[in-house]
Amino acid sequence: ILHCYGSHFSYHQRYPREFARFLPDDDVAIAAKHRDKLLNAYDNSVLYTDHFLARTIEYLRGMSDTRSALLYCADHGEDLIDDERERFLHASPTTTAWQLHVAGLAWFSDAYRREFPGKAEAALRNAAAPATTHAMFHTMADIASIRGGEYLRTSVSLVSDDFDRTAPRCYLNDHNEAVPYPRSGLR
């Protein structure tokens, strides 16, 4: 398990200078008039995360006979002064779609696919399914073929044909309260 600090403000501090592809990227001022710099720095941090994940996959791929998998999911999205509300960061009192819609990635080695073809195929079938980060625990345990009685549920695993696409989804608001999603008016 790897934990990436990822794309958290101040974004320009989240990547080496050689990944400063989008310029200018000095995101020290939070204001609509500096949005281009914020976006550039944020995009550079995403570019670096992509590089990190690609290098990790290449490392795993180099262990050709090893059953390995990589599962990545951002813990939250960011508001980047995206509309007239001029919201910035995350965990605002009124959550936005920008904060909740995040990237995810699953990769499986050839050896893993040979050993567990159904799990890799289920991951493809569930790739566009609505899910929350709550599914990560169950998915990781299922990838590792860990069974745990009542605590591990394949209905919450993205590598299972039992994954329940219709299950209610919730997110935590700024008071750490579970709120059903989708919610009317969320944009």
Regions found by a protein language model. Give the residues of each.
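Catalytic domains that recognize anionic headgroups
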Residues: 1-187
